[in-house]
């Protein structure tokens, strides 16, 4: 069946926050948070304006995701507004790859440091287990200390590095740390 997720939590500062799977109706807000977060940090994959996603594309993507049994997009909602998203996707449909899922997350900088990243990450781990994955994977820019600490805290371990993983517009290299979490 499809992957469903819904959790109400209270952040460390007392703010109520809802984690739930994103659907087609969230397209506008999910796209807004994608575009916003990509202007706020150098640590994400795409530059602002590089993603050709329209609200229509996003609707289709979220509709597919909502109907899928092996991928999910979870949003963090505060006061009716989406402030962050995280998701898991299948790495490959071949039999030898089906146990592996990839994890990605982005959160509005205004909400950093409040435990939302941790809550979203734990939600995705739970969903990955439910979907039958036995390994969750991610890459993180080496300088992104806060993200690395979070991933280590929830149990991810480093298995390799790519010293030239990203190349920035200024021509600098960003080293990527490859991390994995065994779920079985």
Residue ranges and their predicted role:
Residues 1-15, 170-184:
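Terminal substrate-recognition subdomain of acyl/acetyltransferases
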Residues 24, 32-49:
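Helix-loop element at the rim of GNAT/NAT acetyltransferase active sites that forms part
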Residues 121, 128-139:
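Conserved GNAT acetyl-CoA-binding A-motif
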Residues 137-140, 152, 157-174:
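Conserved catalytic-core motifs of GNAT/GCN5-like acyltransferases
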Residues 117, 121, 143-147, 164-170:
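Short glycine/proline-centered loop/turn elements that form peptide/ligand docking sites
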Residues 17-29:
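A short beta-loop-alpha structural element at the N-terminal edge
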Residues 12, 50-110, 121-122, 127, ...:
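Acetyl-CoA-dependent GNAT
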Residues 26, 80, 115:
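Conserved G/P- and acidic residue-centered "switch" motifs that form tight phosphate/ATP-binding loops
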